């Protein structure tokens, strides 16, 4: 069974207005893909399953905080998961991407969909980003778990939640990360790929 915009809207209960924004984002992604490699070419036809659903599933893992969550999306690339989270109203999202042409795309989507109140694009390496305290740190198809912890720790408190979609090598990544970091982690099955898991981590500290 194919999975598209209609299936996504049903699964995540999105309004017509939100659905229209997601549709426009998908159109822009396809338009800008040529020459930019925002997502893998082999996933263009399955982007709602592979990218939109994979990103949106994180919303079910967000705890009740009593305020709008502040997210850090490391290596935002084509906007997954950060732009999907912003469109769905999951909080205030800071998208960090070092490649300028990808940032131009991200900013174009923010402007087109009027997301400037909840999504901020930073064209820099995460190490150069001014420090702030994130409630949630996420990253997708960016780096291994240990590297993400290294990059994200300056923005984390002990209460910061890490939501990190990972592929089939997740077990090895967790084992390797434990060599340099202490953390609690749960591996949640992914809705978008039976081989994938979401690392839900907290209490991350260097050893």
Where are the regions a protein language model picked out?
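Alpha-helical transmembrane segments of helical membrane proteins, especially in multi-pass transport
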Residues: 139-146, 153
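Conserved SAM/SAH cofactor-binding pocket of Class I
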Residues: 56-134, 138, 149
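Class I SAM-dependent transferase core
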Residues: 1-72, 101-115
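A short glycine-rich, Lys/Arg-flanked "PGG" loop and its adjoining helix->strand segment in the class I
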Residues: 149-162
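Short strand-turn motif at the edge of the Rossmann-like AdoMet-binding core
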Residues: 98, 126, 142, 165-169
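Short hydrophobic/aromatic-enriched beta-strand-loop microsegments
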Residues: 121, 159-164, 185
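Residue-level signal for inorganic ion chemistry
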Residues: 29, 85, 166
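Active-site capping/gating segments
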Residues: 91-94, 167-207
